[in-house]
């Protein structure tokens, strides 16, 4: 019953009346003092200027994490790994309404909802044009809808990152503008393992994964390693100063 209730909430939340821009602005203003301090510290720890020009979120279904990258005018810089507390389904794209799969692809954030049942939420443009095209070829009239990145630690087909972390992401996207944020969702980290497509997958999944792999190439693991080393040094220095 709990799973059914969560699934219904994930479907129905976007069907409710969304906040007008004034409500969104009011929420951003309310969040601003805490989020400016938190994000400034987070970006400084990564050695990245704040605020950034653009951001990219990379959701890894296996391992359940959400990477935040920022563009500094020359290249993408890694900022932080956020945990994904809940993401139902398994490897493979979303195919139909109610399959409880998190989609796979490149998406944009198209709505901010400060009145979400999941604290705050950001709606993705799933299904995008590619998703619709594959559904049409296969005769799938309802490929699904209403996919969000949201707060709370429970979800059914969306990405739940917890209330604290969704505040950071919601504020950052609101501050920069939704057109300055992309979301890449992959089944696992193609930078670490060879791409493998399940034998029962539609033929187009291999093409999709090849495309996503090309996009991931702009976000090298070496950049993450460098940030980790920087952060560890900074943390050790802070402890040393405190002593």
Q: What are the residue ranges of the model-derived segments?
A:
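Cleavable N-terminal signal peptides
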Residues: 6-7, 17
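Tryptophan-centered short beta-strand motifs
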Residues: 75-78
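N-terminal signal peptide c-region/cleavage motif recognized by signal peptidases
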Residues: 12-14
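Exported/periplasmic cell-wall-interacting domains
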Residues: 98-107, 111-242
């Amino acid at each position: 019953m709990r799973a059914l209730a969560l699934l219904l909430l994930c479907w129905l939340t976007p069907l409710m009346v969304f906040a007008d821009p004034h409500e969104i602005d009011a929420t951003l203003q309310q969040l601003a003092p805490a989020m400016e301090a938190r994000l400034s510290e987070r970006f400084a720890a990564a050695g990245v200027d704040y605020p950034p020009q653009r951001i990219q979120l990379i959701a890894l279904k296996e391992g359940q994490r959400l990477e935040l990258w920022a563009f500094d005018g020359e290249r993408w810089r890694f900022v932080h790994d956020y945990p994904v507390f809940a993401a139902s389904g398994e490897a493979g794209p979303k195919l139909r309404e109610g399959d409880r799969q998190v989609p796979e692809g490149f998406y944009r954030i198209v709505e901010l909802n400060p009145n979400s049942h999941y604290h705050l939420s950001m709606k993705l443009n799933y299904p995008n044009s590619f998703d619709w095209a594959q559904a049409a070829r296969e005769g799938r009239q309802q490929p699904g809808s209403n996919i969000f990145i949201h707060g709370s630690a429970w979800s059914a087909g969306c990405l739940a990152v917890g209330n604290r972390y969704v505040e950071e992401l919601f504020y950052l996207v609101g501050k920069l503008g939704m057109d300055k944020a992309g979301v890449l969702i992959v089944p696992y980290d193609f930078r670490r393992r060879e791409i493998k497509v399940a034998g029962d997958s539609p033929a187009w999944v291999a093409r999709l994964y090849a495309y996503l792999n090309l996009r991931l190439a702009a976000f090298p693991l070496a950049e993450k390693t460098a940030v980790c080393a920087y952060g560890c040094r900074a943390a050790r220095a802070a402890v040393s100063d405190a002593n």
